Amino acid sequence: MSKEKQAQSKAHKAQQAISSAKSLSTQKSKMSELERATRDGAAIGKKRADIAKKIADKAKQLSSYQAKQFKADEQAVKKVAQEQKRLSDERTKHEAFIKQSLSSMRTTASATMEAEEEYDFFISHASEDKEAFVQDLVAALRDLGAKIFYDAYTLKVGDSLRRKIDQGLANSKFGIVVLSEHFFSKQWPARELDGLTAMEIGGQTRILPIWHKVSYDEVRRFSPSLADKVALNTSLKSVEEIAKELHSLI
């Protein structure tokens, strides 16, 4: 039996005893018991109510916590989904970047392979000497199997002239320089000669001068260092003879 029921039972018995008491002292004694039982019952009832209130408060707190936790879980799931989407988008962008980079690398590699094509001879000349000598020399060398960097054959529409010539200079074993009055008056062939000279100093190539209708004094005035080099002379040898001597060097 619970304490509350025990207190109620005592109060009931005390009430009955008061009704049946024959003496005043017995009534007073039972009245005291009734008061104690009533107080005990009230205290127990209050305590039970307090406990019930606490339980209700805890239940309310639990419900509130569960609601907050549910909302937090929803937000966490949403954040995870957003993060997964972000990672997926980043991965997609990264894959696209890698594909683009690979494509660029392939293009660069292809261009590099083309740029690194090697030649036996680079021919530096003035355009005015093409028909009179250079074209025939190139044809004779090609007939002998030599690989020539010659603008009429090597340069294509859209090519960068300066870059292609720099590539030709860098990837040729020998630099043939056709020295003529036209050559001496041109800036572009002179730049090519500067490039060949720098490479010869670096041990990367050799300059092979050909004198075309010029004298020693004219060459010396243009470049004393070239005048001292052993040269082939179009006034002394035919195109075929010059081509054979040049081809013998490779």
Swiss-Prot record:
Which PROSITE patterns does the UniProt entry name for this protein?
Answer: TIR
Q: What is the effect of changing residue 235 to A?
A: Impaired homodimerization
Enumerate the Gene Ontology biological process terms. Answer: signal transduction; symbiont-mediated perturbation of host microtubule cytoskeleton
| Necessary and sufficient for phosphoinositide binding: annotated span | 1-117
Region Disordered, annotated ranges: 1-46
A Pfam family it matches: TIR_2
Q: What's any one GO cellular component for it?
A: membrane
Q: Which UniProt keywords apply?
A: Host cell membrane, Host membrane, Hydrolase, Lipid-binding, Membrane, NAD, Secreted, Virulence
Q: Where is the composition biased (Basic and acidic residues)?
A: 30-39
Q: Where in the cell is it found?
A: Secreted; Host cell membrane
Q: Where is the active site?
A: 192
Quaternary structure annotation from Swiss-Prot or TrEMBL? Homodimer; may also form oligomers. Interacts with host TIRAP. Interacts with host MYD88. Interaction with host MYD88 was not confirmed by another study. Interacts with host TLR4. Abolishes the interaction of host TIRAP with TLR4.
Function description: Virulence factor that interferes with host Toll-like receptor 2 (TLR2) and TLR4 signaling, resulting in the reduction of dendritic cell maturation, inhibition of pro-inflammatory cytokine secretion and impaired NF-kappa-B activation in macrophages. Interferes with host TLR4 signaling by abolishing host TLR4-TIRAP interaction (but not host TIRAP-MYD88 interaction) and its downstream signaling. Inhibits host TLR 2 induced NF-kappa-B activation and TNF (tumor necrosis factor) secretion. Binds phosphoinositide (PtdIns) via its N-terminal domain.
Q: What is this protein called?
A: Probable 2' cyclic ADP-D-ribose synthase TcpB
Source organism per entry reads: Brucella melitensis biotype 1 (strain ATCC 23456 / CCUG 17765 / NCTC 10094 / 16M)
Q: Which gene encodes it?
A: tcpB
